[in-house]
Amino acid sequence: MKDIWSAWTPLEAKIDRHSAEISVWNRVYRFEDSLFPTSIRIGGCDFLSRPIEFVGRYNGKTERTLKGCTLFELESTDEKTEFQLSAQMGNTVVNGMIGVEFDGLIDMRFSVIPFWSFSRDNLAKPQLDQLYIDIPVKKEYARLYHYWPNDVTSIIPSQTVVNADALPEGGLRMPFKPYVWLGDEFKGLGVSIESDENLEYENAQTEWIPGEDEFVLRIHLLDRMPAAWQGRRDQWVSALNPIDYRIGIMATPCKPVSEELKTSWRAFHVFGNLYAANSDGSVVDCPYINEIDGGLDYLAEKGVKWIIFHESSSRAQDWGLAENPERFRAMIHDCHAHGIKTMMYFGYEMSTLCPSWYDHAPDYLINTPDGHYTGGWQRLPHQRAFMVCYRGGYGDELIRRVEYVMDHYGIDGIYTDGTYVPWECANARHGCGYTDRNGARHTTFPIFAVRKLVKRLYETVHSRGGLIDTHQSTCCIMPTLSFCDTYYDGENIQGSLIKALGSDSGITSFMSLPAFRTEYMGKNLGLVDQFISYANPALGWSIEKTCALTLIHDVLPRPRQAGEMTFESLKTDLDYMSKIWKACAEFETASSVWLPYWQKNDLANVTTEETYMSVYQGKRTLGVLSNLGSRPREVEIQTPAAAMRDVFSGATYRAENGVVRFTAESCVPYLLEIL
């Protein structure tokens, strides 16, 4: 196994004619005469209540097992294993090629093939009229769900929909979504399907079906005989084509999160433009952060370990091309001299200023079914940038540009905006989309192509000792996110959170806490999240209020600089966040045992409505309490401790009859040392 994959453990595979057992970090998949896993273990727990079933219905008769099933090992290394399956179900042949990689992705390509024209007993006539996959998960683990995209299009996410939540007792039904996930706060299972081309379903394509001791995730493939087979039978001169599928299955979390990463990931995001326009349209340069008197001294003093330079760090959007290389290198050098590492922006677009625009734009860009481009961001220097599909060749250029900025500018890592998102695309020039039987074009979602790119990206950056932070709002597709280090989520819902904050119902009236735990906490994914906080003092929204929501989930928001580059613009978020960082370091939260608010513990439990408290148990014990209601309230904390001390104010609250009481303001986090 390459050293670059040291975050994971080597894959181990045991495959014989009838079974396969594949072990990766924290997970074990087992196949017994089956196309899909019969057992999935996550962290030593049996996640499934019973084997996954591949179910077919033939002339009204339901088939749940494969006949004559054999497996054949093609390749096995400590990074990947691949084996074939051959079987029969009803009057169809089932063939498959199953690959499992070291991060836990099962890449399943399989075909359902009608019997040939020489079959006896009328078996040459197609009989298949239903096909689906049942994934039965133990009810104790089947509590949360996520899907993507959160709207009818993936090109721009809805600002009013959170595509994650607690699983309703009565279950759920949805149309086709290329990614769905089911699990709890610490583990789960995701299913990826790039295309709905061979999905012929009547109503819902995905169902979460409740049972007595399980929830079944049902993936509908066919609710009727395939249209291409109807009214026909196989002939030697005109065969019935196989129906092909490609499905990814991946248990999560994908990898361990190191204590060192949690401790050192103190990032500060510089959004301020390096360009400005005069009234006559001419473009002028703006100050760099190292040119602000005392700016880097202040950032270092406040504990910043990483600076992320946003899009205007490149002359051409997403291209990693500094306007003034010497000046840019000097800025990076000065950051390093202050003990601060740097990241440069790359994203999901190709600029009209990109040197290869005129040669390759038609091949690289996303196309809608009617041939239009998508996006079109406009910025200085004057340009527009349209969305790329990483199934095209732009990924090769991206890798070269990342190598360039790390090798020539001394950049330490990269921030990717949307790069890990498999945006829908219908560009036939690079193989996306499909044409249906009526001649209409449809989009597909290049999940596996994006995965291939970001895996290369991870190699490129980590071989140079760097990190990758990705912004992917609403999209928690683990086959791609597996190859980043941290993620930055929540941009699309900032407006809705602000609106909810000002309502009588409070912030959770828009986003439930189970929704936050599913998408924004990261523990079920194996990643560190930093929540987006776009402070808006005029509307009462600050990074402190964001902390009230995030800190009880062991998640830190990211401070940022926005607007004109001035010393004051550095302080908007950082004066407060530096105190949070200092407290986390003082109490060694990264190495402490974390006791979440939704599970009772022996140290501190809040009984007050809309108030929540999580605890870090270490050499010293720290509680984080938030009143997420819309008004101040007196809170009651049941505890065996003698008292609690407010880390920021120094106030001490003594317990009376095992209860600590004090008044907590709305949406203000309280860091309390439990004495």
Language model features with spans:
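Polysaccharide-binding surfaces and accessory modules of carbohydrate-active proteins
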Residues: 1, 99, 107-206, 649
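Acidic-aromatic substrate-binding/catalytic surfaces of carbohydrate-active enzymes
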Residues: 1-10, 14-90, 139-161
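Beta-strand-rich recognition/accessory modules
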Residues: 18, 23-25, 32-62, 88, ...
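Active-site-proximal substrate-binding groove within the catalytic cores of carbohydrate-active enzymes
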Residues: 240, 446, 451-639, 643-648, ...
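Active-site-adjacent "subsite" loops/lids of carbohydrate-active enzymes
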Residues: 284-289, 328, 332-333, 342-409, ...
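Aromatic- and acidic-residue-enriched carbohydrate-binding clefts of CAZyme catalytic domains
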Residues: 308-324, 355-393, 422-451
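Active-site neighborhood of glycoside hydrolase catalytic domains
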Residues: 390-481, 491-495, 502
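C-terminal beta-strand-rich structural cap/linker in extracellular carbohydrate-active enzymes
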Residues: 656-675
